[in-house]
Design a protein with these regions (language model features):
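Active-site gating/metal-coordination segments in enzymes
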Residues: 101, 142-187
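Active-site beta-loop-alpha junctions enriched in small/polar residues
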Residues: 49, 108-109, 128-132, 164-166, ...
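Alpha-helical scaffold segments that flank or form the walls of functional sites
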Residues: 12, 38, 54-120, 142-154
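Histidine-centered catalytic micro-motifs
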Residues: 41-53, 187-196
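N-terminal metal-binding scaffold of metallo-dependent hydrolase/deaminase domains
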Residues: 1-27, 38
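Active-site-adjacent C-terminal substructures of enzyme catalytic domains
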Residues: 166-172, 224-226, 230-289
């Protein structure tokens, strides 16, 4: 927000639109007295997983990120639809009480889109996508395209695409999703440089993430480490331009290219603190680029 704070001012609204902010105070009988309040734009929660709200207090930090993912998958798979929807609505109400009026949410199950669209946020609902087998990229994108072609489910929401992370999405799928985002003019988002294992996975391979993929029957034996940082890797796949990059805990060497490609970084301090990470979130450095 820019500009001076207006104390004891008047805000005029016509047909739902703000038409004037002034220091005068009229005597209009329809005026609302909010003299004990602060009027300001609503907050934006740029990254959330409301579909996982029902798992609150059921997960704890694990010895490794891969172990935490295993626990999340196990608990999440046992959640019934009613509990999940109840959790989504509870999380939404908590956001509203905190002043959030707009959000970017990762939606793993398209069946939940009508529920998400009914929450009355201005929102971008990112279709979270996982697929490390290169051969499956075409089929995955065909299913996503059907969703993108569907009827709008809320006038306040739009769809985006979210390849989950560099360690869970194949190069072919990344490229295909980038093209799909351009075709349908929808925003693209990805978890990037969240954990040190991710950087190791792309540089030389990481046994813990490889083992996790193999357990899920998701490993592609043809895949080879590209020898790049997460940011360099996404740039090589031509999807870095204007990307909404989530977490960005390990990007110190990539700040210039992020600025050049107009990457929007979304930092998640509560998540970072919960996992006990210490080197993270170069907010000021990135803003100064």
């Amino acid at each position: 927000m820019c500009g001076e704070t207006v104390e004891n001012g008047e805000l005029t609204v016509d047909a739902g639109n703000i038409v004037e902010i002034s220091t005068s105070q009229g005597n209009d009988a329809t005026a609302l007295d909010l003299s004990d309040c602060l009027l300001m734009p609503g907050f934006v929660n740029a990254h959330s997983h409301l579909g996982l709200t029902a798992l609150e207090k059921k997960l704890s930090p694990a010895k490794s990120f891969a172990d935490w993912i295993r626990a999340l998958i196990s608990i999440n798979s046992g959640l019934d639809d009613e509990s999940r929807v109840r959790g989504i609505r509870a999380g939404a109400e908590e956001m509203k009480r905190s002043g959030v009026t707009a959000l970017g949410d990762y939606v793993a199950e398209p069946d939940l889109l009508p529920v998400m669209g009914g929450l009355e946020f201005r929102s971008v609902l990112f279709l979270e996508t996982i697929g490390f087998h290169s051969e499956k990229a075409l089929a995955i994108c065909k299913n996503l395209e059907e969703t993108l072609k569907g009827d709008p489910f809320s006038p306040l929401s739009r769809l985006g695409l979210a390849p989950h992370a560099p360690y869970s999405v194949s190069p072919n799928l990344f490229r295909s999703l980038g093209k799909l985002a351009q075709q349908y003019d929808c925003p693209l988002s990805c978890h990037v440089a969240e954990i040190p294992e991710e950087s190791g996975f792309l540089q030389n391979g990481d046994d813990s993430l490889e083992e996790l993929l193999k357990e899920r029957s998701a490993w592609d034996p043809k895949w080879k480490p590209p020898g790049k940082s997460p940011i360099e890797y996404l740039n090589s796949l031509n999807i870095l331009e204007s990307l909404l990059a989530i977490h960005c805990n390990f990007i110190a060497a990539d700040l210039d290219v992020m600025a050049l490609k107009k990457v929007s970084a979304v930092f998640c301090p509560k998540s970072t603190h919960w996992f006990g990470r210490k080197d993270f979130m170069p907010v000021r450095t990135l803003l100064d680029r």
